[in-house]
Structures are given as structure tokens and as C-alpha cells.
Amino acid sequence: MGLTPLNPNGLWLGLDTGGTFTDAVLLADGRRVVASDKALTTHWNLAIGIGAAIRAVLAALPAGMRRDAISLVSVSTTLATNAVVENRFAAVCTLVIGFDAAMVARSGLERDGGIVVRIGGGHDATGEALMALDEAGVLEAVREHGARVEAFAVAASFSVRNPSHELRARALIRGVSPLPVTCAHELSSKLDAPRRALTATLNARLTPQIRHLIEALGRVLREESINAPLMIVKGDGSLMKAEVALEYPVETILSGPAASVVGAGFLTGLTDFVVSDIGGTTTDVAVVSGGRPVISAEGALVGGWRTMVEAIDVRTCGLGGDSEVLLDRQWRLRAGPRKAMPLSLLAHSFPGVLETLKAIATQDRLPDFPTLFAYRNPERELPPHRSALEGRLWAALTLAPRAVSAVVRNASGLAALRRLADAGLATIAAFTPSDAMHVLGRQQGWNREAAECGARILATEERNGTAARTTASPEEICERTYELVVSESARALLAATLAQDPGIESSAERRDSLGTRLIEAAIAGRRLSSIAHATLGLDRALVAIGAPAGAYYPEVARRLGAPLSVPEHAPVCNAVGAVAGVVAQAVAILV
């Protein structure tokens, strides 16, 4: 792989579009941060949040610096990572050519109801055709599924030896449909057709989201008269042109975590460290040795999907500051992997919702889904292919938040509402760790009273569901939520560090009784007995970044016995990393 250092002259604008915030930084001479700011990410129209962040950072430019000195714009994003972790995708039809049933099963393509159509054709290991491509079958698949999907993916057996059937299928699809088409052979030259098909499917599923992002970026840059090349961070930390990202959005899986690794090294000057990036939706952990992150030899693993995308070896878990906190069937607090709008932010944005929250919080007999609220996202219309139940829910929602109990009657209705949210049509709000931090006084900026109502509702719900019939205080609920985030963050860090040495597994994977007890006691900060305790120790610095890092990681580091570094620009570290990278191009030739 050839690495080309970026021209350090002038100003570089770094952006990071995350699940909750869009961050912006300006670097001067490739060395120092001269301005930074952030704005809420507006998922229904990304241009609003991006524009707000860019205008804020430009307004903070020091005297004597001008926007026309910006010579590079580079963007990292967690949109693809979050979509994979939350299983929130565009609907896709995958055509698999020359696959048998076992290959389809091994690919996992039918997981979560994916549309897969087997087509006759394919090649052998020498590139010879096994049979002619079933062109009529391709066209029939488009006719049957084209109206209810947003993209197509095509994967043929041994297409890395002979891609002609994939190319012909794409031409046929484009002849009758305007939808984007991904060919598997263009994403990886490695063998393993089922995994190549999965990677192509993920690429197709992510195409609408990345197009939305890049189009929004283009509009804002034109409005702000910024004329500079636009680059996107890849999962290995290098940069690619925006035009390339439009064709291969799956390359942006782990874009945000990769930028966080680059930014952490840039801001701290460390060469050997463990970095943990806690955002609104996920926590991402990576190990850096000798100034270079470890690259996953097997491809990026995110949300249980093993792709063929070259990326930094990152452990991603669905836990962040805005993870949805609910009680499970055993009436235990659980956080994630779904993200929700914090109740404190909901009431900050829609003050009228506070009275509804107060009314629910004073009830002994709670409605179903008592902490959940939902509203329509602006500027969105319901597509015609949505189900009848989704249509009824859409009609019941408004641009102002409503209690979910007022529009949803059962679990099926809640699942349909979540599908609307997954499609970007609606927003769901719930109690989150960010709310807990507001109640505990460790975070400010939004509506603390709304957060306290959410905690009180959870306490009542817990009392009603358990035999003890005792009610925890809102502060106790919030302290337990804090403990959830701390302990799960510590587990993610421990798993990532143990995985660096072959043969060493985390206690969660081994389930060894003594090992589990020792490690869990250390993570939880509790004694083993009256005369014994367990401690852990990391031999490298722990660099904690992300907006919530300062609230949780002093305690995480203490429990892991790690020296902690929270750098000066930790809340916008990803945006720093977006412009502190390199342009890279790799070429592989089969002889």
C-alpha cells in the first residue's frame, strides 16, 4: 500500500458525522487545532447539522485566518457503523449467481428477513462458466422486488476469476431499474463467495445513507463557498475521494473508529496505547502499537457481520451515551444496542413534552412503554412500500412528540414503530445514560427535570414488576445506569486487549468459573470475599475520547489499573483524525 502525506499548507476542515453530534475542527499547518465546535446531527436532513457545525467552527476562526485558506475537507462518519450495529439498513435484493442453498445459508444473507434470489450461472475456479447466466431470472427478480427495495447486490460464484456474469446482471438491472447495483467482485479479490456476497449486500444496504451524507456535504460546502477536495475516511484510517465512497460505502464501516485512532495518536503524541471512543450509539476500542493501529486480517467485524473490508481491528459494542435504557424481562436494567433520543434532549427541544412526562411519573399504574416517545421526522414522506401497520402508525404520529403508549398497543406495534425509526422516518426518545448523567449532575445542557421523570418512571416500573415492591429513588436508577456503562466499557476494553495474544480469551468467552469470578469482581469493583479482592492492570495508557468520556472513564481506568489520558480535544477527536490521516491506494494483482 502506498501512503501519500497530505499537503500541510493552509487550513484543513475535519468533520465527523455521528449518531448524536456532528463535530467540526480546523487544523492549521497540519499541526494544531485552531477552532472546534459541534452541532446536533439532524438525521432527516444531514445538511442542517453539518451546516450548523461548519458555520460555528468558521465563526471561531482566529483573527487573520480566512475560510478561503481551506485546502482540504475530510469527513469521518459512524453512520455506517451505527447502521450495522443497530441492524438499521435500506431494503436490498441480493441476486446470488451459481450459489446452492448451503452457500446462501453460510452467507447469513437471509438473516433478519433479507431478500435473496438464487440465479443460474456462475464460474469455476479457473474462470470457466458452469452454465449460462439465467438472464430471464435476473429480470424477473427485478420485476418482483424492485418496487420494495432501495438497491440491488449481485454476487456470483468465482466472480473474482471471471466477473462477466456479475457485470451482465448489473447491466440487465440498470436497463430496467434506476436503483444502484453493487457487484461483489469490485469489493474484494479474495475467495469465499458467501462472505463476498454478504459484503456486497452490506454495501448496497449502506448506499442510500452515504449518498445522503455526501450530497448534504456538497450542498453545505457550496453554500459556504468552500472550494476544496472532499475526502472520506475509510475503515483502515486512510482517505478516499467522496466519489469513490459513493460507489463503495461499505469501505466506511468503522470510518469513525478509524478516525478516532488517528486522532488519539495525533492529540496525545503516544505511540503505544489503547483507545476507547464512546459516542452516542457505540463504544469502539482499538490497540495501537508503534504508532500504527492493528489491521484486521479477516476483515471488519461489526454487529456480528464479518465483512471482507480491510479495516482497523476495532471491537465495537452497542453502548453509548444515548443508548436506550429499559428493563428486561427479569426487570433488570439494560442499555443498548439501540440508540434513542435522550428524554432530557427531547424536553429541551420540545418543552411541552415535560408535562406529559410529569403526568406519567406520578402514576402508580403505568401505561405500556412508559418511557418511550416518538415523532415524525421533518421533511419526510411515507414510501408506498411500507406495511399497513406502519402506515397507521405514521398517520398517528405528528411533528410533535407523542407518548408511544398513545399510538402503540402491543409489541408488534412497537416493532413497526422501530422500523419507521430505522428508516429515518421517525425518532424515538427514551431514558438514556445521558439522562442519568443529567440527574447526577455530571452532564449539563439539556432538561434535567425530564431526565429525572424518566428515572422515576423506571423505578416505578421496576417496583411493579418485582416481588420486593420497594421503589428505588431516581438517583439510584441513575447510579445503576452509570455502573452499567462503566462495567460494560471495562469488559469491552478487556476483551480487546486480551484478543491481542492468540489463545487468550476473555472470561465472557471461556466461561471458566474462577476466571470469570475474578475478572467480573475486578470490573465491578467488588470484593471476592471478606479477605480477598482482585485487581486488573493494563501496561499501556488508556486514551478515552468522545463527548461522554470524561464522565465514565476515570472510573473505568481505575478498575482496569490503567493510566488514563483524556486529551484536550477529546470530544472532537474523530474530526481531528479525519484530517490527520493519509491518502492511500492499494493494488492487488493475481498472477
Task: Annotate each language-model stretch with its function.
Residues 2-591:
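N-terminally biased helix-coil "hinge/interface" segments that flank
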